[in-house]
Amino acid sequence: IDTLLWLGRAYFYSGSFLNSKDSYLEYQSMGQDHPKFADSLYELSKVLIELDENVQAKLLLDKMLTEYPGHTLSSKASALLQNL
């Protein structure tokens, strides 16, 4: 399952945003119990912003901040949300 997360990251940094989105969505479909699930919400929101899917990105960031308020990426997610 971690492979999908890393694949999503690799696609993102190579500019293959649609492939990145697909990898993150497949990763997330495997369940919220994985320790990196909150990370994937934040990272997928960045992909969606690149694809001009800002409404969906906002929803993911809101979900992340609501369900994982103490997460290490919460401040970055909050800042990203404010800039949308």
Name each model feature, range by range.
Residues 29-36, 65-77:
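Short solvent-exposed coil/turn linkers within tandem alpha-helical repeat scaffolds
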